[in-house]
Amino acid sequence: MESRTLRLGAGSAGETSRRAGLLPTRGPVEIVRIPTVCRMCGQDTGCGAIALVRDGRLLGLEGMKEAPHNRGSLCARAHAAPEWLYSPQRLKSALVRQGGRRGAPWVPIPWREALDLLAERLLDEKKRYGAESLAVLSPARRSYCGYMMRLLMAHGSPNYGHSGICYVQRSMPFTYTLGGHRPPVADYAQADLMLLWGRSPTCASAPMGGLRALTEARRRGMRVVVIKPTQGGEGRFSDEWLALRPGTDAALALSMLHVVIGEELYDRDFVRDWCFGFEELAEHVRQYTPQWAEGITGVPAGRIREVARRYASTPRAAIDLGNGIEHAPGCSDAARAVAMLIALTGHLERPGGNLWPPRFSMPALKNIELKERITEELASRLVAPEMPLGLQPWELGLASSYKGILDSILTEKPYPIRTLIAAGTQPLASGRGAKTTRAALEKVGFFVVVDVMETAEMEYADLVVPVATFLECEHSLVSWGPWLMAPTRAVGPLGDYGSDTDFWVQLGCRLGYPGLFWNGDVERSFDEQLEPTGLTMAELRKHPFGVSGAVLPRTYERYGEFFGAVGPRLDRSPYLPRGKVALYNEAFEAAGLSPLPEWREVPEGVTATPDLAERFPLILSDHHGSVMYNSSWLRNVPSLRRMAPEPELEIHPETARSCGVADGDRVEVRSPHGTMEVRARVTEDIRRDTVMILHGFWQGCEELGLPGYSLFDGGANPNNLYPLGEHARDPAVTANSSQTLVTVRRIE
């Protein structure tokens, strides 16, 4: 790549180093300013930050203005980084059970010895049972996932299970409907109307631009429709709120398609030139009237028509689709139907609509996941395919269902998993069915926890391997659009451990694949990823604030490019074989799924199980959006815990009165499957027939004397209350239902 395409973070290398405090300056230096990237949200790439360090100790983080996405903004989580880094719950040494007996006391061992022990076991099990006896659970899209996938491919196991609670569940159906490699994003800068559908930009990645974009768009007059059971922080930005019942997004989207097609509000030229299966879809959605959807969603038919018409008739309108749609057995069809709404109304790849990313002069990094090793035979050994085999591998490579892996441990079908590694994930806190998950962790032959902090799952583990925080990593590489950065280690390791990357690279070498793992040299692994850019890590480090390529001039309507996108499918065919929007989806049909989006009832609901609803009259669901926490962690951080010290059940004032509950009361929430005991928060920002809770409370906070919570009955874990089974899962992406019916009563 020509150097003229690069834009340094700020001036010359020496100049930026002095600004960063990395070069000597005259006089004593009390505080060293070190460019880094904040990963307190757990994102694959995070916000640019400056670590403030004195005498080797982190004092805090401040925003890095040179970072193109957060532009100097940081959230409460970033400001709590020192408390998290120095938490008494940090894991600082590898731990193994005394005498190898599960439940026996923990014994500290050297980190390298822990890797030796694990490698020895995996090699023995590969010889005796096959490589597929290893399964790894991990969140999707983490910085180490490429290394984790590389190890599985090198070892010969297809069994990667991502958490099934975010991103993939909507992204895969979009890919097979619209092409591209990820969903097109809402154009906040030019939209006149925004549908926030299951999305919370006020707390989800807010510093990375969502909240800023929403605020700026509202100032220039953009109208906002919020579509979800609660308004949350988006209420102050919204002009209208469609408060649908949890898990009914597919019904709403299908009825909006009914209006758009039935009233001929679609873009005729686009449909003629770029859509396949319009006649079949038009006939199919005739059954999904707004009156029908009203009975399921609880949204009046007139309002459904009004919003559908407004969206279709506004030239610059976009849909910002979020995690909220991903927790129902109809998740994939909800995503497909929303993708079709974007396309049919002429809002795809047009100003103010939904856009694919611009082009950059900075080439993408090289993939290191060894996807070339994926074969039909390897795919056939998936213990519990995340998607039908006809739709795999997808962008993330081969994947098993997170919950399916745990279930297979219990059933031993189609074969038993012998060793399970939980890498940066908490299956008890994050996955559905805490009781069955506990049974699986108790049964599996060998269970390994890899994390920076103590977890609830450690109680069932045989081996615990600590890893470094982002502040302690010697080797790190960040890519965000055209921006590349090699963050500098802010503080030395606080214990005996390496980074997540070190863990997978060193384990790969110990398993006998040193050539595939750069002979243990992590620096070389980053150099390989950087090859397309013409840079090396040594060169990148000369620019502590990173380097940026140019954003090329935006062009629109790039349909041929994205409709022809080819993923890692074994036959190398494009996601859209006809090069057009798949309204009638032949790939889904070939995989045994419905070629057209359809409605699937939630397993337990007002219309799905009316008899059950007579005994359990309220709908329970949960949400992940929080300005202080991230999923199931950070409750042990004092400054964050002060902001939300207890788990709270959101309940409407009228519903609370009918239950004899006042704001702040302790309440029992009971479903047919389990119970919670939490505090009530009375709010008008929720449907009357629905109660909602923030997912993820289990940690205590020693410094504040605040308790932890059980993940089972009587605790604060909504996953303990949901139904399980095939009827609660999406057939295309195995999204799990997070809806059930409950009673709420005041605890005296």
Question: Which residue stretches match the model-derived regions?
Answer:
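Flexible glycine/proline-enriched surface loops and loop-helix/loop-strand junctions
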Residues: 100, 197-198, 237-238, 288-292, ...
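Extended redox/cofactor-interaction regions of prokaryotic respiratory oxidoreductases
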Residues: 146-215, 220-227, 234, 250-254, ...
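Flexible, glycine/charged-enriched surface loops at secondary-structure junctions
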Residues: 129-133, 266-271, 318, 349-356, ...
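Long, contiguous, secondary-structure-rich segments that constitute the structural scaffold
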Residues: 4, 9-16, 494, 500-549, ...
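Glycine/threonine-rich phosphate-binding loop and adjacent beta-strand/alpha-helix elements that clamp
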Residues: 185, 471-493, 504-513
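Active-site phosphate/pyrophosphate-binding segments
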Residues: 256, 276-402
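N-terminal export/assembly segments and adjacent metallocofactor-ligating motifs
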Residues: 1-263, 300, 395, 507, ...
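N-terminal leader/propeptide and maturation segments of large enzyme subunits in energy/redox metabolism
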Residues: 97-113, 263-301, 384, 491-582, ...
